[in-house]
A protein has these predicted regions:
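Repeat-mediated protein-protein interaction surfaces in helical alpha-solenoids
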Residues: 513-528, 551-552
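Short, amphipathic alpha-helical interaction segments positioned at domain boundaries
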Residues: 580, 586-595
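Ankyrin repeat arrays, specifically the small/polar loop and inter-repeat linker segments at the C-terminal end
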Residues: 561-565, 592-597
Length: 603
């Protein structure tokens, strides 16, 4: 509910009622007003809040803001009131003065557009909000605290950001807190004793140098060109990777005197260059992992922009989630050394690489790890002879409708290949778990149109193909029986009568009927035709209710209805504006009419 209230100056505030009270999300101010009062409970609503950062309006004539006692929060950009000179607060939540400051929490919310002679008093300020200094022309600061927290872009668009006199070695310090960098400099050096570092974007600077690795914890989400760590780094590999995670760089450089780590072309390695620790995640293009590399650490490439990669023969291990969420990765050149990607308990090496459209697993790879290619965007997978085990959820959904598996494949663990596979080709015996993966055991009617109703299995034995059709969706215990049947026995021993009867085990009458219809269309077997004939009245009624004209035409082609029934359905077709169906029924009625009939039905 929207409620409007007026300030003493004639401004109109538009309040919305929420769970925690009333919030103003828009306002109009008369041009004649030079003062604006943020109203409170004396104007009905207690605990008023003002969330106005999404309001694209400007009120240049306002020079004074008055805050009444019950106002709880104010969120505005400096640009809304570009000529503010002072704030008068009767609220315990805000200070009076030239800037908007939260009294209890010490948060500087807005400095406003003060001129270059204005002195910014930072006494008791503990945190500076994002864009608090936008448009402020002053570079004069006093009472600077040793420690302060600056949210992202706190000084963006201000003289403090662009002025040069505040910068020392390319960084802008407030007390011992780095709150900005000189974007015109080639290098910014972060002081060792800086107690806080708040930089959101350093793209314009070629190098940002750190000597204290603990400061890197403050840089999650920050972008760099080259991040230089000028420290010997007596850290564990895991600690270093943790420091570098979620920092976006095009290259890293570690001090040459480090006994533990080094960088090769901007990539972080152990000193002996055997373990690849971190690839710069803003670097795109192709990467040849250097010969001599033995282990790619977990998460080493995670989230990077790499597009293709080639592995050396020296590499014997790729860690868990090493390339996870590399969404631009489209090509992988596997080496011949690794034949079991789960050997060390690793998994998910290429999880979420949605750029992968096609994948060919070479013949020397025997085992694929769990989730290795899960949540990718694969449309085609080629599995060569030699592959023996596919781990749990290795391929959780492939947007392909056919799949051929090699003779050597023995085990397919749960949740593989997914619902879209409609045709499977195996040799001699089906691998354990394959049918449990490709058939659907969930009664989810919204997916039937996507996954289809029937499934085709081709088993090649002694150069002869045996083809079986059964429902795509079945109870899990039935799928387990099918999986065991084709895993344990020759296709010649399959119980065809039992397989043909499985349609009746689908989850609903509608699914039973539609599956029988589709299976009859494929096989022309009497078991399906007889089932359709028994249910013909309910099928036609349902198809009319669902508006499925095309299916109705196809169903009437089975010839289950006499002339009298067809005449009733002709009327229904007209009533439902199903012209194609009406034309077909009329033709069938005419065929059934006596040859000497002189009168024909008219469409």
């Amino acid at each position: 509910m929207l409620t409007t209230l007026n300030s003493p100056e004639g401004a109109v505030f538009y309040f919305e009622k929420g769970v925690y009270g009333y919030t103003c999300k828009n306002l109009d101010v008369p041009e004649s007003a030079t003062t604006l009062t943020f109203i409170d409970e004396s104007h009905t609503y207690s605990g008023s809040g003002y969330l106005l950062k999404n309001v694209m309006k400007q009120f240049p004539n306002i020079k004074t803001i008055v805050i009444n006692a019950g106002v709880q929060s104010i969120e505005i950009y400096n640009s809304m009131f570009p000529n503010i000179e002072k704030v008068i607060s009767y609220s315990r939540n805000f200070k009076s003065g030239p800037m908007l400051i939260s009294k209890e929490t010490g948060i500087l919310l807005n400095s406003f557009y003060h001129d270059k002679d204005f002195v910014i008093d930072m006494e008791n300020i503990e945190l500076v909000r994002s864009y608090a200094f936008e448009g402020c022309l002053s570079e004069h600061i006093k009472n600077i605290p040793e420690q302060i927290i600056a949210q992202g872009n706190s000084f963006a668009g201000s003289a403090l950001e662009f002025g040069r006199k505040q910068f020392v070695n390319g960084v802008f310090l407030i007390g011992k807190t780095v709150v900005g960098v000189d974007r015109t400099a080639d290098m910014a050096v972060i002081p060792d004793d800086a107690t806080g570092v708040y930089i959101k974007n350093a793209d314009d600077i070629e190098e940002v140098v750190f000597s204290n690795p603990d400061q890197l914890n403050k840089l999650k989400g920050t972008s760099f060109n080259t991040l230089v760590i000028n420290n010997r780094l007596n850290l564990s590999v895991n600690d270093l990777l943790d420091y570098l995670s979620d920092i976006y760089a095009k290259a890293y450089r570690i001090a040459k005197n480090s006994d533990r780590f080094c960088t090769v072309d901007g990539v972080v390695y152990t000193k002996d260059k055997k373990v690849l620790i971190k690839y710069p995640n803003r670097r795109d293009g192709h990467y040849d992992v250097p010969e001599g590399t033995e282990y790619i650490l977990y998460n080493a490439f995670a989230g990077s922009k790499i597009e293709s990669v080639k592995f050396p023969e020296s590499l014997f291990r790729i860690g868990t989630y090493a390339f996870s969420d590399c969404r631009q990765l489209t090509d992988i050149k596997f080496n011949h050394t690794i034949d079991d990607y789960s050997r060390f308990g690793d998994m998910g090496q290429f999880y979420g690489c949605r750029g992968l459209k096609e994948l060919e697993i070479p013949s020397w790879i025997k085992v694929l790890s769990s989730m290795m290619f899960s949540c990718c965007n694969l449309k085609k997978v080629v599995l060569h002879e030699g592959l023996e085990i596919i781990g749990d959820t290795t391929f959780n959904d492939i947007a392909a409708d056919t799949l051929t598996v090699p003779r050597t494949l023995k085990t397919v663990k749960a949740n593989n290949f997914g619902r879209f596979i409609k045709e499977l080709h195996v040799y001699d015996r089906a691998p354990e778990g394959i049918l449990l993966s490709v058939l659907n055991a969930y009664n989810d009617t919204s997916t039937y149109n996507k996954i289809g109703l029937t499934f085709k299995l081709i088993v090649t034995e002694d150069d002869k193909d045996y083809t079986f059709y059964f429902p795509k969706t079945l109870p899990k215990e039935v799928i387990s029986q099918l999986d065991e049947c084709f895993r344990m026995f020759s296709p010649k021993a399959a119980d065809i009568d039992w397989i043909d009867s499985l349609y009746a085990l689908c989850f609903s009458n509608a699914l039973v009927q539609d599956t029988a219809f589709e299976l009859y269309d494929i096989t022309k077997k009497d078991i399906y035709r007889n089932a359709l004939k028994r249910s013909r009245q309910s099928i036609v009624k349902r198809y009319f209710n669902e508006g499925k004209e095309e299916k109705l035409v196809k169903f009437f082609q089975l010839g289950f209805f006499a002339k009298s029934s067809l005449e009733k359905f002709l009327k229904l077709a007209h009533e439902n504006n199903m012209n194609a169906l009406a034309a077909y029924i009329l033709t069938e009625i005419e065929k059934k009419a006596p040859k000497n009939a002189s009168k024909k039905l008219q469409l």
